[in-house]
Amino acid sequence: MKLVSNKILFLATMVLASSSAFALKDDVNQPINIVSDNQSLDMEKSVVTFTDNVVITQGSIVIKANKVVITRPAEKSGKKETVEAFGTPVTFHQQLDNGKPVDGKANKVHYDLGNEFLTLTNNAELKQLDSKINGSVITYDVKKQQLKANGNGKSRVTTVLIPSQLQQAKGK
């Protein structure tokens, strides 16, 4: 039973690893809380699934989804953990060290821990104060700190920048 608890704790820790690059420095030291209506664990496949009204919190980070699936491949496979969240939409909120909030949403969020690569798919949006980016797909390479937004054949990427926020960014 203790092995099962340790696996769940480790996998749950992976849920928020993607957001720790943006969040308050102290957030990563806070406890991770996952609340859902249902939870299932497949020990053979090392998959934990949380469903219905999933709320994940750690410090200032809050993630809400309909379903979250955390997969931890066998160590010998050479693959790393992945976290997938599904919702209409999945939402997240974080407080940055500079005090500004970041909000995001998408119908699907995928995080590959091995590559430290975050993908928001379908109706993806990132917003900080009044500035925002909308696209069909938004990707973020955590290591390189590079963001890319793509439209699809029907819609284009939309970016809204507020001049006062641009001036504040230049001054810092």
From Swiss-Prot:
<dbReference type="InterPro" id="IPR052037">
    <property type="entry name" value="LPS_export_LptA"/>
</dbReference>
<dbReference type="GO" id="GO:0043165">
    <property type="term" value="P:Gram-negative-bacterium-type cell outer membrane assembly"/>
</dbReference>
<protein>
    <recommendedName>
        <fullName>Lipopolysaccharide export system protein LptA</fullName>
    </recommendedName>
</protein>
<dbReference type="GO" id="GO:0017089">
    <property type="term" value="F:glycolipid transfer activity"/>
</dbReference>
<comment type="subunit">
    <text>Component of the lipopolysaccharide transport and assembly complex.</text>
</comment>
<dbReference type="GO" id="GO:0015920">
    <property type="term" value="P:lipopolysaccharide transport"/>
</dbReference>
<dbReference type="GO" id="GO:0001530">
    <property type="term" value="F:lipopolysaccharide binding"/>
</dbReference>
<dbReference type="GO" id="GO:0030288">
    <property type="term" value="C:outer membrane-bounded periplasmic space"/>
</dbReference>
<keyword id="KW-0574">Periplasm</keyword>
<dbReference type="InterPro" id="IPR005653">
    <property type="entry name" value="OstA-like_N"/>
</dbReference>
<comment type="similarity">
    <text>Belongs to the LptA family.</text>
</comment>
<dbReference type="Pfam" id="PF03968">
    <property type="entry name" value="LptD_N"/>
</dbReference>
<feature type="signal peptide">
    <location>
        <begin position="1"/>
        <end position="23"/>
    </location>
</feature>
<keyword id="KW-0732">Signal</keyword>
<comment type="function">
    <text>Involved in the assembly of lipopolysaccharide (LPS). Required for the translocation of LPS from the inner membrane to the outer membrane. May form a bridge between the inner membrane and the outer membrane, via interactions with LptC and LptD, thereby facilitating LPS transfer across the periplasm.</text>
</comment>
<dbReference type="InterPro" id="IPR014340">
    <property type="entry name" value="LptA"/>
</dbReference>
<dbReference type="GO" id="GO:0009279">
    <property type="term" value="C:cell outer membrane"/>
</dbReference>
<keyword id="KW-0813">Transport</keyword>
